[in-house]
């Protein structure tokens, strides 16, 4: 009976929502849906397109365990200026060469379809840890757009440590700092773990906001086996 009363009370409170509140909520939902629907628009232009003259793919890797799969693309900015919002289209294939995943999907998060920023001459290991493969991932290919030019810091300082690890992954916790005078929103922290030149684990976290001249906590899960590996963390600025 108590549970029923709680449920009724919740419904009653929900019914008190004003028309203005309902309108504002519907507007937020509509904007969010439009944002997600448009997320794959830049990728459509990359299908069958020649490689970018500004951003080069230096290598690709894929790791997978029973916990999931992650694709990693090593990219480099060959220009003398910072590039922002660089579209990236990836396709993951199995050992037989059949496509098992692509990030060119309506509704996918923008953080999984673009590189936030790359400093002049800089490089980054971009991670997609949401690979919903229909088969066993074996390889990944990538096509990049040119992005937009602009300024900003090369990278946001990141401090972190691995709090837990196993053969199936590891948990990384830390802080990302924003030394600029403007808040950074939707900051992606990329994490890759290597044994020498071999990628053995990867993951990422999205921080809603890092305040101006402040810092924010993050936690991410590594896919793969990070045991004894060298961990690299990068957080490109978003503005």
Please report, for each region that a protein language model flagged, where it lies by residue.
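Sec-dependent bacterial lipoprotein signal peptides
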Residues: 1-14
